[in-house]
């Protein structure tokens, strides 16, 4: 092998090793920051074809509805627990902190935290989901003041209010 080919081979090997090392380090760093999304049924019965359940200590996000009657608050601290359910089961979520204003029993919620024993998720963050038709009270009042008829009545008219 002539010296020119030899140097190109060494250069190609160094580049491949560098790319492999970089990819490995990036995947290792991301592994601790990846939060998989689970429903309560997937936590209880497994996710996917292989029915993989989350490991104890795994970071995850759980989404579902807050079970009516399951919210329990500690009167002295900000600690609370509630159950999140779907059609296939319910999982207990514990949280310490102030909940979002839209958090209610029977409402959708997404909790991000760590899976623990006893099918419990220790949440670090709780996000309340709302109906896409939700309108803040201020906007609703403004719409009532500015629009005396429903939006459907405005279809088929031009900007002057005359029928098209």
From Swiss-Prot:
- Where is it localised? Cell inner membrane
Query: What GO biological process terms does the UniProt entry carry, in alphabetical order?
Result: cytochrome complex assembly
Q: How does it sit in the membrane?
A: Single-pass type II membrane protein
Keyword vocabulary terms for this entry: Cell inner membrane, Cell membrane, Cytochrome c-type biogenesis, Heme, Iron, Membrane, Metal-binding, Signal-anchor, Transmembrane, Transmembrane helix
Q: What GO molecular function annotations does the UniProt record carry, in alphabetical order?
A: heme binding; metal ion binding
Q: Which GO terms describe its cellular component?
A: plasma membrane
Which positions, given as ranges, span the membrane?
9-29
Binding of heme: at which residues?
130, 134
> Pfam families this protein is in?
CcmE (PF03100)
* Signal peptide residues on this chain, from the entry's feature table: none
Tell me where it mainly resides: membrane
Stretches assigned to the Cytoplasmic side: 1-8
Top-level taxon in the UniProt lineage: Bacteria
Keyword set includes Metal-binding: yes
Task: Give the start-end ranges of region Disordered.
Answer: 140-164
Sequence ranges on the Periplasmic membrane side: 30-164
Give the protein family: Belongs to the CcmE/CycJ family.
Q: What is the documented function of this protein? A: Heme chaperone required for the biogenesis of c-type cytochromes. Transiently binds heme delivered by CcmC and transfers the heme to apo-cytochromes in a process facilitated by CcmF and CcmH.
What HAMAP family does the entry give? CcmE
What protein is this chain from? Answer: Cytochrome c-type biogenesis protein CcmE
Organism of provenance: Yersinia pestis
Q: Which gene encodes it?
A: ccmE
